[in-house]
Amino acid sequence: MLGKGIKKSWGWLGLTVLLLGSPCGWAAEFSASFKGTDIQEFINTVSKNLNKTVIIDPTVRGTISVRSYDMMDEGQYYQFFLSVLDVYGFSVVPMDNGVLKVIRSKDAKSSSIPLANNEQPGVGDELVTRVVPLNNVAARDLAPLLRQLNDNAGAGTVVHYEPSNVLLMTGRAAVIKRLVDIVNTVDKTGDREMITVSLNYASAEDVAKLVNDLNKTDEKNALPSTMLANVVADGRTNSVVVSGEENTSPCAVEMIRQLDRKQVAQGGTKVIYLKYAKALDLIEVLAGNGTSGNRNSSSTNSSRPSSTRSSSTLNNSNSSSSGSSSGSGSSSSSSSSSMGFGSAFGSANSSGGRTIVIQGKEVTVRAHDQTNSLIITRPPDIMRDLEQVINQLDIRRPQVLVEAIIAEIQDADGLNLGIQWANKRAGMTQFTNTGIPISTAMIGTDQFRSDGTLTTAYASALSNFNGITAGFYRGNWSMLLTALSSDGKNDVLATPSIVTLDNMEATFNVGQEVPVLTGSQTTVGSGDNIFNTVERKTVGIKLRVKPQINEGDSVLLQIEQEVSSVAEGNGSSNSSLGVTFNTRTVNNAVMVTNRETVVVGGLLDKTAIETNNKVPLLGDIPWLGSLFRSKTQTMSKRNLMLFLRPTIIRDPQQYQQASISKYNSFNNEQQQQRGQGNSVLDNNTLRLSGGNTYTFRQVQSSISAFYQPEGR
């Protein structure tokens, strides 16, 4: 049988197996002929011939017809088996244990397909997955093109992973190998070069924008990026960098050199509308920010020829010079910078203008308040320097929310007790710290006995007295008892807050004006009239702060804070000695990190005062000595702490969030105080444009919903 074919037939199934002799052993060759055969029977026949265990998915059904006229070895026979299944929409997925699984091709992409590489790329129609890294081309751009070349309807798929810039391709090994060859051909660096062109007259930003705009076309007529040169401006050196292929870069460089030409010297006027800065303030900076440069004097173009002005000079950053000012009889020093204006300038004209000298040429800068714009009359060749300075100054300044916490607790106890004696013929024991001297009481009593009035001496004696007083006046003897016990507590918790621009001082005042008697005068006439002079002093909370935002979100705060109040127990405005004020001030500068709380001042104070007045010898007698003594005792404790927390606000969203947070805090506190019910602001209505009316709660809910992330 060696060298001859043996043909064996199973009804409608024909299969020929031929064994050939070789020096090393036996090799099997196969030829197949199937007509109208059930596909599962075909799979079982191949499984038996290849000695492989095959699992068939229940969805694999149908009949096949195929015929092979050539003899095939085992590898070719297996590839023939895979090709037949592929034609009918099925695929073979090898398992780790050597078992083959036959499933539908559209389900195979989610199975455990072997991972191929350059050493083992796979053969023929077997399913493989390949990971291909890209070095020069973006995977997201190449993936859609490769999908059109793959069997997307079957097991083929092409996806990209952007963070690693790789392609993940699944499909038949032969197809994937062809796609990998295409990727290797496309993923190559172009022969690009970079050329730096220094400009002498034109602005680098303007030239780069012009050249790039010329390269822009609509999508239909867009040229490939490899045929275009990319131009980037370097404002620091006033040069442009051209990047492109060898055949495109020279054209761009030639265009740039043609644009970099000296302009004809002629005057021109340009209006620059400012976005954030104030026009009048910016004129002062342009004319008065002293830097290196010559400062010359010249006469103004005003109708008054006798008036004079001094001018400023602006030099390029790569030039240096020194000079002195003249014309006004004064001189000043200048500091260096990349671009500068002399510190001397003339008086403002009716439109708030200045005339300065830049690179030896006069430039007139005027402000228009109504539109917040600058009107600049200048030679065209120096306008670029002016615009750069203006653009750097006209920026949105961040804001700072400064929140303060003032916590103060005061506790004071006092005791005043004393007995005074007097005799018209022998003298008296008088203690003035009791509030009512006994001599004043005796004068008032004598006056009452003589004319029956209590409007002078008694009124004066009792006007400033607190507590209880009792006594007698009989014959030559009189006695007066005074007693007073006081207990005062004062708790202050204030949380003032204020928002201000960076480097802008802000003031916050909350309080009341207290009248203070400063003088009194009696006029003589038909009746005695008393004329009082009164001044008003503001008491309450004062906060003055100037924040400066530094690098790293730190804030330098210059603080002036004052907390004042009228002292308890001595607050009557008609007191003979006036009103007593409690004042606490803090004036310092601190460096605080954004959103951090820092204590800027504190006081822990405890005071105890005890005063004993007595009559010598008599005041020391046990029991009876109390009749000849007066005792005053005062104890006070005070705890005061001041805290600050700055919050940097850089955009409107942060400002809106801070506003909502403040409102919610106020609303919650109000509801806690009232126990129940809505906030007072909830019922207030806001009339917006278009005639619509909303409550404050509706507006707050709309704002919160706008900033709520999607999907919640």
Curated annotation (Swiss-Prot):
Residues 126-190 are annotated as: N1. GO terms for cellular component: cell outer membrane; type II protein secretion system complex. Keywords: Cell outer membrane, Membrane, Protein transport, Signal, Transmembrane, Transmembrane beta strand, Transport. Residues 267-394 are annotated as: N3. It is found in: Cell outer membrane. Residues 191-264 are annotated as: N2. The record marks G511 as: May serve as a pivot that allows opening of the central gate for substrate egress. Residues 28-124 are annotated as: N0. It holds the Pfam family Secretin. Residues 399-651 are annotated as: Secretin. Residues 1-27 form the signal peptide. Residues 653-712 are annotated as: S domain. GO terms for biological process: protein secretion by the type II secretion system. InterPro entries: Bact_Secretion_Sys_Channel, GspD-like_N0, GspD/PilQ, NolW-like, NolW-like_sf, T2SS/T3SS_dom, T2SS_GspD, T2SS_GspD_CS. Involved in a type II secretion system (T2SS, formerly general secretion pathway, GSP) for the export of proteins. Required for the translocation of the multiple pectic enzymes. This subunit forms the outer membrane channel. Forms a cylindrical channel with 15 subunits. This is Secretin OutD. It comes from Dickeya chrysanthemi (Pectobacterium chrysanthemi). The lineage of its organism: Bacteria, Pseudomonadati, Pseudomonadota, Gammaproteobacteria, Enterobacterales.
